[in-house]
Each structure stands twice: as C-alpha cells, then as structure tokens.
Amino acid sequence: GQLSVIERGGRKALRVRHAEAASLTGLGPLAYWPADPAWRLRARFIPHPPGRTIAIMDITSQQAAKPNPGMVEFEHSGQTYRLEALEGDAGGLFLIFADRTSGHDSYGAGRYLDTQAPAADGTVTVDFNRAYNPPCVFTDFATCPLPPPENRLDLAVTAGEKRYARPAG
C-alpha cells in the first residue's frame, strides 16, 4: 500500500492506497458515448483579473476558494455557453461541469474535463469526448469538487464518460 498526507478544510488526514483493493480489482467496465467530432469545440478563453477565486464545494459540503483564471465560452447547436475554469496541469484548464445528462446518462454530480493551455490568440480546445467521471464515482473516500452553479449547462452533453454502474456484490 501507499500512504499520503492530505489536507481538507485545514485538517490533515492519511490517505491509504492499495493496488489490490477490492474497489480497484472489482472495477466494472466504463461506458462512453461514441466519439463525436461535433463535441470537439474551439472555445474562447476569457481571462479574469489575476488573483480571482471561485467558491468550490466538494462532495462532503466543504467549500474552498480555488484560483479562477477565467472562463471558456463556446457554441453548440447555435447557442453560446460559458464555463468557469480552474487552474489545470501545465498551464491548462480544469473544468467541472454538470449538464442535462447529469443524474440520467452521466454521473449526477457532474463530470470533469481537462484542456491544454489557451493559445496566444485566446482560443482553447474543449473536447467533451474527453469528459470523465470524478473519483468519488468509484470510492466513497474521495472528496470530489462539485460544479459551481455557473457551470450547470442547460445542454445535454452526450459525449465522454457515461454514468458508472458499480458491479453487484
């Protein structure tokens, strides 16, 4: 196994990971919508003033202020939508969103999506085919951030990972 120290809400805890845990070895198949180029969108990154944060609630009802570098604006089916972005890896963006499939065909609390860093001209590719479920789908011990109210899309994103069905037993 592996131990690591995590901090949540100003409190420290130990996280234990074990490669042969039943939650990993008993993992059922993942389901995805068929890849669709119509969900690979060219978006516009709209930066916020430096230092801006956004309140993000996690699945345990803990709230934290997270760096919010800007929002992405995209069009789909003739409508314009915006998602507030968090800082991602390597200068990229981390998007937490819910949509009209949430709780039906996809995980009820929302999904995640990582992007590369916005280009110099302010464009960024938002490929919903790469949307994935948060870790709390697979374990009761994860403290997953939830979509802020601004990131609840009035749109059915029929792309990316679908709702996970835990194996019986």
Residue ranges and their predicted role:
Residues 23-25, 50-51, 83-84, 104-106, ...:
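Short helix/loop capping segments that flank catalytic or ligand/cofactor-binding pockets
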Residues 5, 12-16, 71-76, 95-97, ...:
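Generic recognition of long tandem-repeat/solenoid scaffolds
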Residues 65-102, 106:
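Mid-length scaffold segments of soluble, non-membrane domains
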Residues 100-104, 112-117, 123-125, 129-169:
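Extended, aromatic/histidine-rich regions of cofactor-dependent oxidoreductases associated
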Residues 6-11, 64-68, 87-91, 117-122:
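Short, ordered beta-strand-loop transition motifs
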Residues 15-22, 97-101, 129-131:
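Secondary-structure transition/turn motif
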Residues 2-66:
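Surface-exposed beta-loop interaction hotspot
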